[in-house]
Amino acid sequence: MDKTLEIIKDRINEKQAQLAHAVGEGAAKDYAEYRAICGEIRGLSIAEGFILDLADQMERNNDE
């Protein structure tokens, strides 16, 4: 995987872990905040998927 993409993926994973830990510790003041945090985690997961797809495509293009 490209070094830049690896760094971005790692940062996304770190943020996901921070948010998951915060939810586990009861950081959400109410249900709306809980939903917002869960939405952020979901968005980060989608972004990570895009990065992994891009890295895969870049590797396939380099093989051609």
Where are these regions (language model features)?
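Short, charge-rich amphipathic interface segments used for partner binding and complex assembly
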Residues: 28-59
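N-terminal acidic leader/helix
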Residues: 1-29
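Sequence-pattern detector for short linear motifs
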Residues: 12-14, 18, 38, 45, ...
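Short intrinsically disordered terminal tails
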Residues: 1, 58-64
